[in-house]
Amino acid sequence: MCIRDRAGKVWGVTEALLQNPVVEFHRIEVNKGGECSTHKHAHKWNGFFVEEGELEIHVFKNDYDLTDKTILGPGDFMSVKPGEYHLFKANKNTIAFEIYWPELLSEDIQRKSVGKMNA
């Protein structure tokens, strides 16, 4: 279902562009210095794509005592796997897209032929 649900946040604005049981697609505007809550998603991946600005993603790893910090600029993408606490903050005024999707079976492909190069 395509909606245009726009909501103000303490850090800026989020707008749900697409939401259905398989994927969610949100446009976010994050003001410089804006930071979301530390949170996790039990079953969904959370992807971030930056259109303009700079978004800093902190991921608090479950498998070891470490916090990964990644700074995304225009054209950069990263994802956070389900169950990992994370947050984002904007080092500059930022426009980005958040994509959410469930963990699906990664071995979903059934090949009938093998790829090749033709002369």
Question: PLM features: residue spans?
Answer:
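A short, N-terminal "cap"/entry segment at the start of jelly-roll beta-barrel domains
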Residues: 4-27, 35-38, 68-70, 112-119
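Double-stranded beta-helix
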Residues: 7, 85-119
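Conserved hydrophobic/aromatic beta-strand scaffold that supports enzyme active sites
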Residues: 25-29, 47, 69, 77-79
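Short, well-structured hydrophobic secondary-structure segments
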Residues: 28-43, 48
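Short hydrophobic/aromatic-rich beta-strand segments that constitute the beta-sheet cores
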Residues: 37, 57-59, 98
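Glycine- and acidic-residue-biased ligand/ion/polar-headgroup-sensing regions
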Residues: 43-62
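Short acidic-glycine-tyrosine-enriched beta hairpin
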Residues: 61-83
